[in-house]
Amino acid sequence: MKTMRFLSFLLSVVLLLPLLSSCAEAPQSYVAPEGEAWFMGFASEEIPLPETDDPLYIAGYRQGKEITGVLDLQRANAVWMDTGDAGVLLIGIDCVGLGSDTVNKIREELSDFCRQTNCVSVNVYATHTHAGVDTLGLWGPIAVDGKNDAFMENLIHAAVSAAKGAYADRSQGKLLLGTTVPEDLLYDSRRPQEYDSTLYQLRFVPDHADQNGIRLLSYAAHAESLRGDNTLLSRDFPGAISDGIKAATGDDTLFLPGAIGGLIMTRELVDEPFDATENLRLTGEALTKAVLSIDSETELFPSLSIASEKVEIPLDNTLFLCYRFLGILGNPAVDGDGETGYSLVSELGVLALGNVTLALIPGEIFPELVSGNGLGAEDPEPLSAIARRHGIENLLIVGLCNDELGYIVPPSDYLINPDAPYLDGIEDATGENHYEETNSTGIRTAALLAEAFEEILSLITEPRG
C-alpha cells in the first residue's frame, strides 16, 4: 500500500527537480593553544508547545499519529567549552533528529554571538527521543510534512537562548573521564549482536563550589523506552537521567547518543501488561544509578581541537528524494552520482578534549562500523581502527549530529527490495528484516564517512604507522 501511494506521485516530483551544482567546501579545523585549565558552562531551555490548533505529530513508529498529552516537555541543552582561547558549543535537542537546514538556522541566529565570544564551532545534535514532536517531517500523513512550523521556531529560539546562557555560565575547573557498564540493559534487534554497553561520562568539576558541575553522558541506545503505542510527549530516558542526576548531585547533564544504529534499544523492565511510563521510570532510575556508581575517573589535560568537513553523500533512496523535493526534508541536494542523480550535502566532525575524541556523526551509525566486529571485506575500515592509527585513546560517538542521514549501514549487510527499492523492506535468507535500509541514504554512506573521518583527523592529529 505504501509503495503504491508513493509511486503515484513519484513521477510528478521528479519532473519538478531543480538543477543544482556541487558545493564542496574545504575542511575546517581549529587547534587551541596549550591551556592551563578547562572553562565550561551549561544552560537549558524548555521548548514550549505552540499556541495553535495545528496538529503535533509524534516522531516515530507510524505516520499521522498525533500527540495526546504531555509527560515532560522537550528541552534544548547547551554546553560551552574552551581552554582559555576560542570556544566550542555543543547543543543537544530533545528530539528525534534535525536536518542540516535546521542546524544551519540555529548557527545563523548565533553568528553575531559567535563573533563576539570567539566561538569557532557550533554543533547541534538530537538525543533521538521517539516521544517528541516530529522535527524531521517524516511522521505526518502520507506525503505531508509532519513538522509544525511554530514548534520549530520555538525549538530554534530555545537552542539559541541555551547557547548564550551556556557562555554566560562559563567557569573554570577540571574535566574528568569515567565509565561504567549498566547491567543487562541493552539489546540489538538485528544481527550481528554488536553494541557498546559502556556508559561514558565527562564530568566538569568547577573550581568554585557555588557553580554547578556538568556531566556529558554518552550512551548508545535509542531513546524509546516508552515504546511504539505511546502518544505522550516526553524526553524519554535522556530526560529522566538529567532529572535524576540533578536531584542527586545538583549537576547539569548533557546526554549524547552513541552508535545506536542496528537497532540498539534498552530492554523492557516491566512485566506484562506493558506500562510505558513505569518502564521509562525504571529505565531512567537504572541509568542514573549507573552514572552515580562511577568511582574511578581520569583527569583530562586542558587541550581542545575541532575539525569538520562537508561530505557529499550519494542519494540512492528515492523516498528521501521525494521527501526532499516535497519540502519535507531540507538537506541541501546537489548533482551527484547517487542512483537518483543527486547527492545530499552533509557534515562530519571531530572534537578532541584532552585524550578523548568525539566523532560527530550525521546519522545513526551501526556499531560494527565503529568497533569493526562483524564487518566484511567490502566494509570500510572501522572508525576505532582509524582513530588508533591517529593516536586516539578514547573514541566516543555523538550520533545525529549536525544532520540526520538516517541509518548508516555496513555495505556487507546492505539489502534492499529489488521490486520496490527503499519503499518496502525485505527479509534476507535467514529471515532477518532489513528495515533500516529503507531509512538510509544508500550503500556508500558508511565508506564516505570513514574517508572523511580519516581526512579530518589528519588536521588535528599526527597519524602513527
Identify the residue ranges that each predicted region occupies.
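Bacterial N-terminal signal peptides that target proteins for export
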Residues: 1-10
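C-terminal motif of bacterial Sec signal peptides marking the signal peptidase cleavage site
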Residues: 18-22
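Conserved beta-alpha junction segments in alpha/beta enzyme cores
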Residues: 27-125, 129-288, 295-465
